[in-house]
């Protein structure tokens, strides 16, 4: 079965007893001055944490020359103009024709490109990285080049790459759940998305090219500084059909578990707290005709159950990989028809090879990142890809996060199931003893996700309101912070431009007793946005990172378009940033420090 290939990435971890959902206190080894930061680090006595003031413009912009502040103001003001934004692509084209490419590129470097992009190649980005590092701000390196496709071309590529051979010839039509079926109305995944890069599958050679670019990005991260990050998207590494099919498998298998939980009177419980009685579960599966009682008893052994004697969702999920010989039994009941349906789809030989190469590319990147001492951040994507992306990331974490978290998963807190996803992954890391690495974001695909769910006809996966998303973000973050109070085997990045969320994090860190020097909590913002948050944090000793894209001017124009649109979509934050920039320029004029030189 083709999906077994997924788990070649995994090195089997020893099974220990199931734990509760609450982080449990653990005895820590004595602290030593030489202790490394992060996973496995011992916590030593630390100096007091300086107060962080996001209104002190002198400190916030200490790293910037006055002309840079003027450029920032100009760019942010242009991003606030609805007329300019509505026609910015046409304006770019006109400017390029009038000025010529050379002068156009120079103009872009003086404005939008210079504000949002670090440079054209690995050498040209080094001065900015060194400069920011001197003021306490690290980097997440990202090769920002994208294909500039027409909507029609993007739709054609998406339909071809997300449809299996069986679906094309009619034998596999409509087998997947609605959410995981490709739909022509949403073939252009860029539509309605303003803050995330999008890749479209062309062929295996193109995926190899992306991998080589990412390897160069990892090399640059390792050479530029210690402790850097690189970011990757799994849709750049292979045919998205596999991600859709695997996501469908994982979702249906999880839903089957919750159906049986409801039969045992456990409907509505948190996912990590739902535990099924083994004997009742075995009876239910046998009555459905999935397998004989004798076969089923072989599934649930002390090795898989620990000492709990019950089956939770983590035990249940493990059947797909650790018990792959049971693949012929992986069927689930169709609620509408009452019939048993196979869970795993059939792949052609070519499709299986494409999937295998995708997994190999992931493996190559993870190995290279670990060798270079670079942490690899797996970006989140659309909800119909995300179950597969999260599971593949988890398999990489099991293998590479033994001593410290090199692989970070991204959790989108606008999803209704975000808290379940965070708690389940954290629990699995505890049980198996590997290091948990997470980036928490609100999410980049909200408008597209809502429209798609309504149009195709499945439950909206997004929280109903912005306030509900904020509450979910803080709930997930608080859970991870409570874990950090007792364990050094986890790290979290608070990737947010929301000042209230950053304040919440700082307050909880102080209450819990987490020191910034321990390096377990870090912050992330985009280059060119929210310097008034990033630099005060960095100068106070908190680990903070800028998401730093690079690439040739003409090839990062799609990225620049999204940055302009994103600034317009978060007007409250951008307006505050403009006010602070004006305030600092007036202060410099008033005090005679207009020619301020950062030092």
Curated annotation (Swiss-Prot):
One of its GO terms (biological process) is proline catabolic process to glutamate. It is an enzyme of class 1 (oxidoreductase). Expressed in liver, kidney, heart and to a lesser extent in brain, lung and muscle. Pfam families: Pro_dh. It is found in: Mitochondrion matrix. One of its GO terms (cellular component) is mitochondrial matrix. One of its GO terms (molecular function) is proline dehydrogenase activity. Keywords: Acetylation, FAD, Flavoprotein, Mitochondrion, Oxidoreductase, Proline metabolism, Transit peptide. Its EC number is 1.5.5.2. The modification N6-acetyllysine is found at residues 356, 367, 485. Its main location: mitochondrion. Residues 23-39 have a biased composition (Low complexity). The keyword Oxidoreductase applies. Belongs to the proline oxidase family. Converts proline to delta-1-pyrroline-5-carboxylate. This is Proline dehydrogenase 1, mitochondrial. It comes from Mus musculus. The lineage of its organism: Eukaryota, Metazoa, Chordata, Craniata, Vertebrata.
């Amino acid at each position: 079965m083709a999906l077994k290939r997924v788990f070649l990435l995994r090195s089997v971890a020893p099974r220990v007893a199931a734990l509760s959902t609450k982080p449990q206190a653990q005895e820590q080894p004595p602290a030593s001055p030489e202790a490394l930061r992060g996973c496995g680090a011992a916590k030593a006595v630390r100096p007091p944490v300086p107060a962080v003031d996001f209104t002190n413009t002198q400190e916030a912009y200490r790293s910037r020359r006055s002309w840079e502040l003027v450029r920032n103001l100009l760019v942010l003001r242009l991003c606030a103009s609805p007329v300019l934004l509505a026609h910015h692509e046409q304006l770019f084209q006109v400017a390029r024709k009038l000025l010529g490419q050379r002068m156009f590129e120079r103009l872009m470097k003086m404005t939008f490109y210079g504000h949002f992009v670090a440079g054209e190649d690995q050498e040209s980005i080094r001065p900015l990285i060194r400069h920011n590092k001197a003021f306490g701000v690290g980097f997440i390196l990202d090769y920002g080049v994208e294909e500039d496709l027409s909507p029609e071309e993007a739709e054609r590529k998406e339909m071809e790459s997300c449809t299996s051979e069986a679906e094309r010839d009619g034998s596999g039509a409509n087998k997947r759940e609605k959410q995981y079926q490709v739909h022509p109305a949403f073939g252009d995944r860029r539509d309605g998305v303003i803050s995330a890069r999008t890749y479209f599958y062309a062929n295996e050679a193109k995926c190899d090219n992306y991998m080589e670019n990412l390897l160069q990005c990892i090399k640059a991260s390792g050479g530029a500084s210690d402790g850097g990050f690189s970011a990757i998207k799994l849709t750049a590494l292979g045919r998205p059909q596999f991600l859709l099919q695997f996501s469908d498998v994982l979702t249906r298998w999880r839903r089957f578990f919750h159906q049986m939980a409801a039969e045992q009177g456990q409907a509505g419980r948190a996912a990590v707290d739902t535990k099924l009685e083994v004997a009742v579960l075995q009876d239910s599966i046998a009555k459905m005709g999935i397998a004989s009682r004798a076969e089923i008893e072989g599934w649930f052994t002390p090795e898989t159950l620990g000492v709990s004697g019950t089956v939770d969702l983590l035990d249940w999920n493990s059947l797909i990989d650790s018990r792959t010989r049971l693949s012929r039994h992986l069927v689930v009941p169709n609620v509408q028809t009452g019939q048993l349906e196979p869970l795993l789809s059939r792949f052609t030989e070519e499709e299986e090879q494409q999937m295998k190469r995708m997994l190999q590319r992931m493996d190559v990147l993870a190995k290279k990142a670990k060798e270079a001492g670079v942490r690899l951040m797996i970006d989140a994507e659309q909800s119909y890809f995300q179950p597969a992306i999260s599971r593949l990331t988890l398999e990489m974490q099991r293998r590479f996060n033994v001593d410290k978290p090199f692989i970070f998963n991204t959790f989108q807190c606008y999803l209704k199931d975000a808290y379940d996803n965070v708690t389940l992954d954290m629990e699995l890391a505890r049980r198996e003893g590997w290091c948990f690495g997470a980036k928490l974001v609100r999410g980049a695909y909200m408008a597209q996700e809502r429209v798609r769910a309504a149009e195709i006809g499945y439950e909206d996966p997004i929280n109903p309101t912005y306030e509900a998303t904020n509450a979910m973000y803080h709930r997930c973050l608080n859970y991870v912070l409570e874990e950090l109070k007792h364990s050094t085997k986890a790290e979290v990045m608070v990737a947010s431009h929301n000042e209230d969320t950053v304040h919440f994090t700082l307050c909880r860190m102080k209450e819990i007793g987490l020191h910034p020097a321990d390096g377990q909590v870090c912050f992330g913002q985009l280059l060119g946005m929210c310097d008034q948050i990033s630099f005060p944090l960095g100068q106070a000793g908190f680990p903070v990172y800028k998401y730093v894209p690079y690439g040739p001017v003409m090839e990062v124009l799609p990225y620049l378009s999204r940055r302009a649109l994103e600034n317009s979509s978060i007007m409250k934050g951008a307006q505050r940033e403009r006010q602070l920039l004006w305030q600092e320029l007036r202060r410099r004029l008033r005090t005679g420090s207009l020619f301020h030189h950062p030092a």
